[in-house]
Amino acid sequence: MEKAKLSSALFAGTHFDRKRFAGDFARFRQGPPAPDVASAAAPSPEKKRKRQSKAKAKKSKKRRAEGADSASDAVEGFSVFKGLAAKKDEDDSEKKVETGKSEDSEVVRRRKEVEREIERAAILRKKFDIHISGQNVPAPLENFEELVSRYGCDSYLVGNLSKLGFQEPTPIQRQAIPILLSGRECFACAPTGSGKTLAFLFPILMKIKPGSKEGVKAVILCPTRELAAQTTRECKKLAKGRKFYIKLMTKDLSKSGNFKDMHCDILISTPLRLDHAVQKRDLDLSRVEYLVLDESDKLFELGFVEVIDSVVKACSNPSIIRSLFSATLPDSIETLARTIMHDAVRVIVGRKNSASSLIKQKLIFAGTEKGKLLALRQSFAESLNPPVLIFVQSKERAKELYKELAFDDVRADVIHADLDEEQRQDAVDNLRAGKTWVLIATEVIARGMDFKGVNCVINYDFPESASAYIHRIGRSGRAGRSGEAITFFTEEDKPFLRNIANVLISSGCEVPSWIKALPKLKRKKHRVNRDPISTLPDED
């Protein structure tokens, strides 16, 4: 204690650098003496061995811990070897880039292929003068073989086409067939004799199953019995080789047919007969898949609209496909038809409401009714090139003209509404067979009837409308053959010349300038009260 006091007295007011003289300062502290710096820096060999063993133990422990961590990391999907993991990540990223590039290139390739298909379709339509209106319209056919490659058509159908003489599809067939096969509804307007019948028959025969006992699968409506019979014959020829039940709705079948037990795949009929069978005989049309209105403009004329509406309602299948085919498609008819159709495609070949450019058309001024008879006899004397169709405006005038030609040693026949079905069919068959040279007819035969090789059509009486004119002259110039159409007109017909002249102009025929200068008429139809044709004395 005294030493401490003495030390305090000696060193009072003096400052020591404790850091600098740490060793010396420690000597004056109480407790065990601290080791000097030299001894701390140089430990004994024994301590060195202990420290080394502890360090080794720590390192081994650390390695074991790292091994455990890396093992757990491997379980979670990470590589133990960082270099390999980095390389793998690079490879994966490169693969992703390559996959992305390949996907992008595939999208580009598909887009280019679609663009090429659209371009090919546009070129084909332009080549064949096909005009379409609608969304996502299928590409037209290049040939009939595409029906097999694109749509899986049975070979027997293509074989039947070849046997029937069909080598290449006509323009309306190129576009209308793919539309119907794609499940779309359509309006089809094409010149007479352009193959419209085949355009709707072929998809039906491809899509429905033959020999079905589930009821009627397809209904085809025609404005006349003759056209319905002709369509039935063509359908049976095309379906040869398969057991399709194809029925023509005759008068007897309509009135007394047993429709519950009747096997029928395709039913072809006129509107009135079919409506009678539905209303009076309980004909079931609820499973009809295809409804075709052939010569639709005539079917929608006044008097048929209610009947057509009744038939459409009877065909109540929600997935039914409806289509309209005609040589003319007036705007009023199209507007009316669209009320019963959904997402329909409009197809027009050539110009709307025009005649075939293969028909040579002439207008001849005859002055009076007697002048027309003289002009007709003169035409026969100069160049009678049978078979010839002559159109008049009434059955009375048909009978009168037939009597006149009977005295001229011309092998003529007549067809009109007063004849029964068998007589009318005989008259048509005789012209087809060449037994008669001239067939005198009313409008009843102007719709859709196909006479092989009709060379000339003569409009003895001026047609009532441009539409009637197109259908009349369309009996010639069919299936790619040339034809001739002669139209007589009198003073009474002059006011109506302009409407017919427009058809001639659109078909590329020459029309005198004075006819072009005539005023347009708002009336679409007319019927002139004409003097009798006959120059013979009345029979008492």
Swiss-Prot record:
Recorded catalytic activity of this chain's protein: ATP + H2O = ADP + phosphate + H(+)
Residue numbers covered by motif Q motif: 146-174
Chain ranges for the short sequence motif DEAD box as given in the UniProt record: 294-297
Keywords recorded for this protein, A-Z: ATP-binding, Coiled coil, Helicase, Hydrolase, Nucleotide-binding, RNA-binding
InterPro entries linked to this entry: DDX52/Rok1_DEADc, DEAD/DEAH_box_helicase_dom, DEAD_box_RNA_helicase, Helicase_ATP-bd, Helicase_C-like, P-loop_NTPase, RNA_helicase_DEAD_Q_motif
Residues that, per the record, bind ATP: 190-197
GO BP field: maturation of SSU-rRNA
GO molecular-function terms, A-Z: ATP binding; ATP hydrolysis activity; RNA binding; RNA helicase activity
The EC number(s) this enzyme carries: 3.6.4.13
Domain Helicase ATP-binding stretches: 177-347
Basic residues bias locations: 47-64
Membrane-spanning parts: none
Domain of life the protein comes from: Eukaryota
Pfam families for this protein: DEAD (PF00270), Helicase_C (PF00271)
Helicase C-terminal domain segment(s): 375-519
Coiled-coil regions, chain positions: 101-129
Chain positions covered by the region annotation Disordered: 24-73
Family: Belongs to the DEAD box helicase family. DDX52/ROK1 subfamily.
Note on domains (UniProt): The Q motif is unique to and characteristic of the DEAD box family of RNA helicases and controls ATP binding and hydrolysis.
The protein, known as: DEAD-box ATP-dependent RNA helicase 57
Organism: Oryza sativa subsp. japonica (Rice)
